[in-house]
Amino acid sequence: MQGNTQPREDLLQFQQSVYNEMNDSVNRRNMLEQLVLYYGKPQYWHDLFQLARNEKGLSDEQQLDIVRLRLLVGDLKVAGDFIEGAQSALVADYPNDAKTILDKGNQAKVLNAATDERVGRLVKMTNDRVAADGAKQAELQQKSASDANASVKLGLIYWTYAKHKEAETAVRAGMKGKLADPEGAKVALGHTLLSQGNKPEAVNAFNSVARTSKWASVARLWSIYARRA
């Protein structure tokens, strides 16, 4: 993103460094968000992810959403990153996300199921969960007519299989009902819109998340990514 109002990189770097020395994570994060938005360097993303991951009280879904974005921008580097990311996806019940993460780790020659027994077990568990995912989707489809939460979950599962339009439809249907996590549904909608190339609408969805929500920091990360995409 370029423009007349673009802040100077060196000044942002200096300010975030000062806030880091002061242990002021809120203002440091604000500076890092601007560095990522305007300059997008891998180190800025990495530092911003570190702050996000250190936030207390994140749910399994929120932690996984950070992993998803780290994968997209190339912040998963070592075997532990990919293994932890895949485990997060399994815990949150998105086995195809776990498969995607493990496949990327294999392609990057960071993971090797043939020589690492731990990776081999994780790959097998993931493949077994993916094989059983059809039944899970069928169950959610049945529930979704009367359960808004099931509809949003189904939409996110569709999204992990690149069924983007079906995902959007399911999430929107769920948002019409009573949800346990309405702010999370807004992030889910943003995902489905961004996947279809609807960037302005996706940004609006991410930005609509309440600032007081635990989803707020995750939504800001995705909003920045969508604005740069």
Language model regions located:
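Structural motif corresponding to the intra-repeat A-B loop/turn of tetratricopeptide repeats
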Residues: 22, 55-56, 92, 161, ...
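C-terminal soluble interaction/assembly domains
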Residues: 146-229
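Second-shell loop/turn segments in exported
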Residues: 88-92, 205
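Alpha-helical repeat scaffolds
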Residues: 1, 24-38, 59-73, 97-106, ...
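Residue at a conserved register position within TPR or TPR-like alpha-solenoid repeats
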Residues: 19, 52-53, 88-89, 158, ...
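Flexible, glycine-rich surface segments
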Residues: 80, 89, 101, 105-108, ...
